């Protein structure tokens, strides 16, 4: 009995395990693979900061790649692609957008893809960067599309990796939620929910130990002292994604465009809310990919038949080979 009590006390006194760690509302406590840099600016009458990663190449090719993360991702989740493009001679920049990860979550903020595009342009202006290869994944694909439509003279090439928003969910019949309803859902997010969703959507029902880092990155913010702030901004961002489609403007893109899409993806915002007859037709990425490729003038389409929503994480070698082959030189 005495030994049991001693063991129990030691366990209680032990530091939190990785699965139990909590992070601040701006991801304080979570370590990125490189020191994050900060861009301080004013947006919507508030002082804000945008965290970003920047890698400089040993043998520059004179080009800059900007990597835009998705809704459940951060700049750090681009780690493999950051390293790969740096090795290929690119200067590589990956920002955390306002409202995400290590960047500010302002007290009040009107989220729009237009605003996030302006913020990204301001970061590039501050760094003296003109033209970029713009790579957007998931929600970052919607943002990259908006940026390319607004600032086509700044984009040498647009690359979209399993972008969401290839269909208009509300037009397809998905019930619209209020921000308060999104918030109620986000307040209940757990690591188990995140893991189950990522397993089925990102990784085609496969799981590897390295994926857990990204589950805990997100879950740790919800568990932390600023968890309600994280949930509120997540609700605002979901509302932005749901109500601001970009697909109707694909035909207006005038930059070289490369689509890299895992066909096993089944992402559709609010799909769980839809009636069965609507739910069954949402997130059909084989069809959506081909339709999008046809809608964008001159687009190139590369399909990964066995991969899901995050091909750059599920099969980095194959993804990076397709990426470098598809980049204009």
Label the predicted regions.
Residues 76, 97-113, 169:
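Glycine-rich "HGGG/HGxG" loop immediately N-terminal to the catalytic nucleophile
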Residues 189-250:
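Conserved alpha/beta-hydrolase catalytic His-Asp/Glu region
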Residues 286-329:
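Catalytic active-site module of serine/aspartate enzymes centered on a nucleophile-bearing elbow/loop
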Residues 44, 48-102, 322:
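Conserved HGGG/HGGXW glycine-rich cap/lid loop of the alpha/beta-hydrolase fold
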Residues 25-55:
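N-terminal cap/lid segment of alpha/beta-hydrolase-fold proteins
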Residues 145, 149, 158-189:
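Flexible "cap/lid" loop of the alpha/beta hydrolase fold
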Residues 223-294:
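Conserved serine/cysteine hydrolase catalytic core
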Residues 114-132:
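Conserved acidic catalytic loop of the alpha/beta-hydrolase fold
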């Amino acid at each position: 009995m005495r030994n049991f009590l001693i063991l129990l006390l030691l366990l209680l006194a032990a530091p939190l395990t990785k699965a139990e760690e909590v992070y601040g509302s701006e991801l304080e406590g979570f370590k990125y693979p490189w020191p994050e840099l900060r861009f301080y600016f004013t947006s919507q009458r508030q002082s804000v900061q945008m965290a970003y990663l920047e890698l400089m190449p040993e043998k520059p090719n004179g080009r800059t790649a900007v990597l835009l993360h998705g809704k459940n991702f951060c700049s750090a989740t681009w780690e493999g692609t950051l390293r790969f493009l740096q090795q290929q001679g690119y200067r590589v920049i990956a920002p955390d957008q306002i409202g995400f990860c290590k960047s500010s979550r302002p007290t009040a903020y009107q989220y729009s893809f237009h605003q996030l595009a302006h913020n990204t342009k301001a970061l590039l202006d501050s760094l003296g960067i003109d033209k970029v290869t713009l790579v957007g994944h998931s929600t970052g694909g919607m943002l990259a599309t908006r940026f390319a439509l607004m600032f086509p003279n700044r984009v040498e090439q647009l690359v979209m990796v399993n972008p969401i928003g290839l269909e208009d969910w509300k037009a397809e019949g998905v019930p619209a939620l209020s921000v308060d309803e999104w918030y109620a859902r986000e307040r209940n997010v757990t690591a188990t929910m995140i893991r189950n969703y990522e397993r089925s959507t990102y990784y085609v029902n496969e799981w590897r130990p390295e994926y857990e880092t990204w589950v805990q990155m997100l879950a740790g913010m919800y568990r932390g002292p600023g968890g309600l702030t994280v949930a509120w901004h997540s609700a605002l961002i979901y509302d932005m994604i749901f109500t601001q489609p970009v697909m109707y403007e694909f035909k207006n893109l005038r930059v070289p465009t490369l689509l890299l899409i895992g066909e096993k993806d089944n992402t559709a915002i609010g799909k769980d809310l839809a009636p069965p007859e609507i739910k069954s037709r949402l997130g059909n990425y084989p069809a959506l990919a081909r339709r999008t490729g046809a809608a964008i003038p001159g687009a190139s389409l590369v399909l990964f038949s066995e991969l899901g929503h995050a091909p750059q994480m599920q099969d980095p070698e194959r993804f990076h080979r397709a990426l470098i082959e598809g980049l204009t030189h």
